Curated annotation (Swiss-Prot):
One of its GO terms (molecular function) is ATP binding. Keywords: ATP-binding, Ligase, Magnesium, Metal-binding, Nucleotide-binding, Purine biosynthesis. Pathway: Purine metabolism; IMP biosynthesis via de novo pathway; N(2)-formyl-N(1)-(5-phospho-D-ribosyl)glycinamide from N(1)-(5-phospho-D-ribosyl)glycinamide (formate route): step 1/1. N(1)-(5-phospho-beta-D-ribosyl)glycinamide binds at E28, L29, E88, D298, K367, R374, R375. Belongs to the PurK/PurT family. This is Formate-dependent phosphoribosylglycinamide formyltransferase. One of its GO terms (biological process) is 'de novo' IMP biosynthetic process. Involved in the de novo purine biosynthesis. Catalyzes the transfer of formate to 5-phospho-ribosyl-glycinamide (GAR), producing 5-phospho-ribosyl-N-formylglycinamide (FGAR). Formate is provided by PurU via hydrolysis of 10-formyl-tetrahydrofolate. Homodimer. The lineage of its organism: Bacteria, Pseudomonadati, Pseudomonadota, Betaproteobacteria, Burkholderiales. Mg(2+) binds at E279, E291.
Length: 406
């Protein structure tokens, strides 16, 4: 890809010259991408499956559709005729995007093929392990309980079972013995994004820590695509759901080099422009590929405090063919603010108290409904070192209380 494939000029929103970007998925990550695009004069259309999603609140126009419905998706694309389509979630009719991109009628970020491959864990795992030769955990796929029982027996215990399509740890189980298999199947069926009924069984890796390596493919001054790496982000997940993250994560130089090599191998194959969140397991100088998202990553919200340009700014600039800057400005951390109760009229207490903690900031996502363990916001903290930043971010998050009135 060269400059001839990118946007050559940026127009004026809501005019005949407008540069139009359509986001498919408008949650908290999409909201920040929209804000970054609007700062660059882009007209943004936000699409999601429910009304008043976070990204809907800041876009020029918004729509509510079933994004897995090929007909509805194609009709909306034809109606709006965006210059770029930016998938922000996995549950999209990606086969239709591939068809439309191959026909030359749309351009998908980073590519329609990348969106299709990463829409579920099977496509990207087979690409990384079987085609690209990346080290991964051992794995099997299963379509029913009997196949799952056989797969778990082959992999051995402990193991992890996940739906091939889910997010934020939904439907994920850690199995200690064969007695856990049936419950894991039911959990995966309940937690999957779509009713595919297919799961992945992963062998347990004895890793020391896990990272997200934000990897950016952007056009350089020479007109060619260059790969940039942000400083590694350490994070803690509970049942597959991001709880806190920090940047930078210290790594053995050999491990960092391997992480760069794996991330570049995978993102080069996926192609296109934009930011990718590459998840990796690390122990000493050993690195295993886990997953990749061709879009900003939830653990990367820390970059709103830690970097010269956040992951959202990087994504927006890269997809528009603009230069990027991945420099770290300060150690920082993020901690999730969770919903505590179920309800649809949501407000927040304790924000002022949280912001009295040195170096902190708060982002409230504006989700119209709260429920227990739903991500409702994030606390950010800058400090001279990561340990202090983590302590302050967690303390700030703990002070913010989402309350519901109904």
């Amino acid at each position: 890809m060269t400059k001839s494939n990118t946007i050559n000029r940026i127009g004026t929103p809501l005019s005949a010259t407008a540069t139009k970007v359509m986001l498919l998925g408008s949650g908290e990550l999409g909201k920040e991408v929209i804000i970054s695009l609007q700062r660059l004069g882009v007209e943004v259309i936000a699409v999601d499956r429910y009304s008043n999603a976070p990204g809907h609140q800041v876009a020029h126009r918004s729509y509510v559709i079933d994004m897995t419905d090929e007909v509805a998706l194609a009709e909306l694309i034809n109606q709006e005729k965006p210059d770029l389509i930016v998938p922000e979630i996995e549950a999209i009719a990606t086969a239709k995007l591939v068809e439309l991109e191959n026909a030359g009628t749309i351009r998908v970020i980073p590519t329609a093929r990348a969106a299709w491959l990463t829409m579920d864990r099977e496509g990207i795992r087979r690409l990384a392990a079987e085609e690209l030769g990346c080290a991964t955990s051992p794995y099997r796929f299963a379509d029913n309980l009997k196949e799952l029982q056989a797969g778990c027996a082959e992999i051995g215990f402990p193991c992890i079972v996940k739906p091939v399509m889910s997010s934020s740890g939904k439907g994920q189980s850690k199995l200690s013995s064969s007695a856990d298999v049936a419950a894991a199947w039911d959990c995966a069926a309940a937690g999957g994004r779509v009713d595919s009924g297919r799961v992945i069984v992963e062998g347990f890796i004895d890793f020391e820590y896990e990272i997200t390596l934000l990897t950016v493919r952007a056009i350089g001054a020479d007109g060619e695509v260059h790969t940039h790496f942000c400083e590694p982000i350490g994070h803690v997940q509970v049942n597959g759901d991001y709880v806190e993250s920090w940047q930078p994560q210290r790594m053995h130089p050999g491990a960092l080099q391997k992480a760069h090599e794996i991330a570049k191998r995978v993102t080069d194959n996926l192609g296109g422009l934009g930011l990718f969140g590459v998840e990796l397991f690390v122990k000493d100088d050993m690195v295993w590929f886990s997953e990749v998202s061709p879009r900003p990553h939830d653990t990367g919200m820390v970059t709103m405090a830690s970097q010269e340009q956040s992951e959202f700014e990087l994504h927006a600039k890269a997809i528009l063919g603009l230069p990027v800057n991945v420099a770290l400005s300060t150690p920082a951390a993020s901690a999730v603010i969770y919903g505590r109760h179920d309800g649809k009229v949501v407000s927040f207490e304790g924000v002022a108290e949280a912001l009295h903690i040195p170096g902190t900031d708060i982002r409230l996502f504006g989700k119209p409904e709260s429920f227990a363990r739903r991500r409702m916001g994030v606390a950010l903290a800058k400090a001279a070192d990561v340990d202090t930043a983590r302590k302050n971010a967690k303390a700030a998050a703990a002070k913010v209380n989402p309350v519901v009135s109904s």
